[in-house]
């Protein structure tokens, strides 16, 4: 089945984006205070469903896009948009989220704590890829955590696709699945050539998984499956291709209820709550 990519005919034409050496997309889906300074570019995800809502920046329904897949692909619709619509003059591309950014907490205002263009310029001299710190699951593996939180068939289908179409990535995948740490959040900054390669590989894998996986009975949260799976693929791609990276801290615009989050984690592991 051919994958659908659409071009939004209803959006007004935009002037060519003013591109610096770096563009970091800020994925958002509702009105929120956003950074409107270089190198940050707010992008409204799932915009095809909200023709009357414009949040500033760009929309993932413009140009070549998969905006209609946002309920299942989450912020990856922004990633796809960037791969196919950002001019190649953007020599590095990143992805963040309206509630989380790379930065160091120094003030009471998170948007003042995010890294500046000059910070990123220095980071990219040090490494072609910048990531957040790894998540450590401590009491279970990356695979068991996913299975307790979502559906086993997601991982099994992904494993089958890698085995059949990208077998060179299977050793790194199995090593990651049996380990307890991985980079999640779908946050990174990459040199453009690596960004293009990663996106092409990632969507080739996920589109094939989508063809094979029946999610018709999934809850709204579990239906975000391809966004969740992508978080378990970034390290697989990096490790297989021996690509170096550095890690930088994350600042949040909203507080996390760690007690609730931790309780849910334990209950899922015990099979009491999905």
PLM feature spans:
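ER/Golgi luminal nucleotide-sugar-dependent glycosyltransferases, focusing on the catalytic module
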Residues: 17-274
